[in-house]
Amino acid sequence: RWEETAEGHVLRTAEGTLRARQVIIATNGYTEENVSKHLAGRLMPALSSIIVTRPLSEEEKRAQGWTTNIPAFDSRRLLHYFRLLPDGRFLFGGRGGTDASNAGAEDYRREITRSFHDLFPAWKNAEITHYWRGFVCLAHDLVPYIGALDERNTVWTAIAYHGNGVAMGSWSGRAVARLLTKKAAREELSPVLTRRLSRFPLPAFRPLYLKGAYVWYGWEDSR
């Protein structure tokens, strides 16, 4: 249990107690709703899924006309992203559905594999050797946030990367650490990244908002 006190912060666990003057929340799409009142109702987790093929032969790459190692994505609203990996495997990713259960994961494995075969029909016989998914994090205004959450400047976060966390998360982690240690000033960051996180309207309905967005964007993509 995490408690905020006048002296600082106390984290109590079954293994012991930890005290700190400053806290950074860096859990992104895995941030629990009740972890902090400063984040309640302000974040929306969304699943993203990835499959990876066995290494492709040069003949297979030629058959599909694939000639680059540069990551790419398509122009859909519910986009797919993909790249050839250094060992010749092909990585293909996209949204991960709205069911976080194990059964939902298997259903979406089939769905994303179908999408992969639709876009790359020459590789329909390429075995899928890896599949995983996880949560990305969305903010109401679809912009990351870096900075303090409380008026005392003792609770900090770098959060809401909207599926771009591999690059943005690394950069943001360094940025929030520099703010906390006073090696940088808030004004040195773009005001777009340091504005206050706004709450979603009627935040209890966020799962429905996400499902509705998928239906709408899916219809737009089908036009």
Sequence positions of predicted segments:
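C-terminal lid/capping helical subdomain adjacent to the catalytic/cofactor pocket in oxidative enzymes
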Residues: E151-R223
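Extended alpha-helical regions
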Residues: R1-G8, L18, I25, L208-Y209, ...
